[in-house]
């Protein structure tokens, strides 16, 4: 086990909040492995880089000697987490949940040590709970307390329906912490209300309340919206190595550091040195290559990482980018079609959309397929339309 100071530094790196740090120190002073809880509802089978922000933190705590209890919400997935939703989420069948859970855990073990991870399912206790016990659990909170949640409040004020079972979700998730006697629970910043509910229920049950560690939500490739499949701005960890490499290379030079902070296992000192190198004139592309190779090596292999790098170099060089490439500087974020028009690469947005559909638009040598992607400030990439039109576009 590392020292308390070292453990705190690792825990706090990249974290949004630690609630409550003094309580965490007291737990660490016991010098025994802590029960670290992380729960997920397997509502989809695939993991993307956004999910790995929390899982990476679990791995760090696992390496420090703590016990990772990875909770599969096979019961709660059939309720549907209302967090951040503007409408009632459709429930999944037990069969869908089981299939998703199987592939989800398989991918999780690309990061966590399987032999040191305890997999639990909340159906083990909730499927045995009687109706009277569930009603007793529901009595542990109030409607007023639930309406403190931003998403519930907005729906209520907007006249949108909120089902009773959605009010139960935070209580059910919170009770998981009681059943597991968790010392620490990790989650995204959007889960804070639910995590706090776990603390409240533990106190009511006479348990020492869990410490909460919230991790930031990773923005997607557009640098704006939260990474998600629905926004088509994600990188799946099971995508081919070449795809991962190309997508990492497509992020802006400025936004690259956000990915380093939340996804890389490099030390903060090492990352600071890379920033100094770029400030001194090093090519940001080379730094992005380092990140792409690190991630591919983690999810695939070192050989795949090197192969993807060589493939990228070959394809990029084949584009024969002219030495006198036109540099276009813009000062506002723009959808791809408008961006190409402003840069003079197309005559109209309709032409831009047509070229994208035809697969004739590339960014740093990677074919673009999403006609709805928006490029934010910090963009610094080479755009190609057809075989001969090039422009380096910078958004300040």
Swiss-Prot record:
A molecular function annotated in GO for this UniProt entry is: tyrosine-tRNA ligase activity
Where's it found, cell-wise? Cytoplasm
Please give the superkingdom of this protein's source: Bacteria
| Record flagged with keyword Aminoacyl-tRNA synthetase | yes
| Main localization, broad class | cytoplasm
Report the EC code(s) recorded for this entry. Answer: 6.1.1.1
Task: For this UniProt record, give its keywords in alphabetical order, as a comma-separated list.
Answer: Aminoacyl-tRNA synthetase, ATP-binding, Cytoplasm, Ligase, Nucleotide-binding, Protein biosynthesis, RNA-binding
- Motif range for 'HIGH' region? 42-51
Under Pfam families, the record lists: S4, tRNA-synt_1b
| Record GO biological process | tyrosyl-tRNA aminoacylation
Protein family per UniProt: Belongs to the class-I aminoacyl-tRNA synthetase family. TyrS type 2 subfamily.
The record's note on quaternary structure and interaction partners says: Homodimer.
What protein name does the entry list?
A: Tyrosine--tRNA ligase
Q: Which organism is this protein's natural source?
A: Francisella tularensis subsp. tularensis (strain SCHU S4 / Schu 4)
């Amino acid at each position: 086990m590392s020292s308390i100071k070292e453990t705190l530094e690792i825990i706090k790196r990249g974290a949004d909040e630690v609630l409550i740090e003094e309580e965490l120190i007291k737990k660490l002073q016991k010098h025994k492995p802590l029960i670290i809880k992380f729960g997920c509802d397997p509502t989809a089978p695939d993991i993307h880089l956004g999910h790995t922000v929390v899982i990476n933190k679990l791995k760090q705590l696992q390496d420090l000697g703590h016990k990772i209890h990875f909770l599969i919400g096979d019961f709660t997935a059939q309720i549907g987490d209302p967090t951040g939703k503007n409408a009632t989420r459709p429930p999944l069948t037990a069969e869908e949940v089981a299939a998703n859970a199987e592939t989800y855990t398989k991918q999780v073990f690309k990061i966590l040590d399987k032999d040191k991870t305890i997999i639990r399912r909340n159906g083990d206790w909730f499927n045995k709970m009687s109706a009277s016990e569930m009603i007793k659990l529901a009595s542990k909170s109030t409607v007023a307390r639930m309406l403190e949640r931003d998403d519930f409040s907005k729906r209520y004020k907007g006249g949108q329906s909120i089902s009773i079972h959605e009010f139960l979700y935070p209580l059910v998730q919170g009770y998981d912490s009681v059943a597991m006697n968790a010392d620490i629970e990790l989650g995204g910043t959007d889960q804070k209300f639910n995590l706090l509910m776990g603390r409240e229920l533990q106190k009511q049950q006479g348990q020492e309340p869990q410490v909460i560690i919230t991790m930031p939500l990773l923005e997607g490739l557009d640098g704006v919206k939260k990474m998600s499949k629905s926004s088509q701005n994600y990188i799946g960890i099971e995508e081919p190595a070449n795809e991962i490499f190309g997508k990492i290379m497509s992020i802006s030079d400025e936004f690259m550091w956000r990915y380093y902070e939340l996804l890389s296992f490099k030390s903060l000192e090492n990352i600071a040195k890379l920033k100094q190198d770029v400030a001194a004139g090093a090519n940001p592309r080379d730094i992005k290559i380092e990140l792409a190779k690190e991630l591919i090596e983690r999810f695939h292999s070192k050989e795949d990482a090197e192969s993807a790098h060589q493939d990228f170099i070959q394809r990029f060089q084949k584009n024969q980018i002219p030495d006198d490439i036109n540099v276009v500087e813009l000062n506002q974020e723009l959808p791809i079609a408008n961006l190409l028009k402003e840069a003079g690469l197309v005559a109209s947005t309709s032409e831009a959309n047509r070229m994208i559909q035809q697969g004739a638009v590339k960014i740093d040598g990677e074919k673009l397929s999403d006609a709805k992607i928006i490029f934010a400030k910090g963009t610094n990439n080479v755009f190609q339309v057809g075989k001969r039109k090039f422009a380096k576009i910078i958004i300040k």
